[in-house]
A protein has these predicted regions:
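Beta-strand residues in well-ordered beta-sheet regions across diverse protein folds
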Residues: 47, 56, 65-67
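Beta-strand elements of well-folded, non-transmembrane domains
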Residues: 10-12, 26, 50, 68-70, ...
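C-terminal structural segments of small proteins and small subunits
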Residues: 6-7, 60-90
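Terminal, regulation- and interaction-focused segments at domain boundaries
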Residues: 1-34
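Ser/Thr-rich, low-complexity intrinsically disordered terminal regions
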Residues: 28-54
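Generic alpha-helical secondary structure
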Residues: 11, 15-19, 23, 39, ...
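A generic structural signal for beta-strand entry/edge sites
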Residues: 3, 41-43, 59-63
Length: 92
């Protein structure tokens, strides 16, 4: 198991400003349903093969946290890059 935390600063004031852009960016980075997304209030819950995580808005930052088990843990670098890209795109 591997834990992953990403933080991306933003000038946006809350998840309501980021939600649509974050959904679109994640769909682009993870096409074909590779990553399942579910909104629970202002928290985006994520899941995929061997991975569970969430993205929230905390203190002026988008914060992503995930636990990666097999097979996702073997692709940590790629997952970190794609989630980070989506978060930076949404935060801009």
């Amino acid at each position: 198991m591997s834990d992953l935390t990403l933080e991306v600063p933003t000038t946006k004031t809350g998840m309501e400003e980021i939600r649509a852009a974050l959904d679109a960016a994640l769909a682009k980075e993870f096409p074909g349903g590779m990553l399942r997304r579910n909104w629970a209030g202002d928290v985006l819950e994520l899941s995929g093969p061997g991975a569970k995580g969430m993205i929230s808005f905390e203190d002026g930052k988008l914060v992503g946290r995930a636990t990666l088990g097999p097979p996702a843990s073997m692709m940590r670098g790629m997952i970190e890059q794609k989630i980070g890209t989506a978060m930076r795109t949404a935060a801009a």
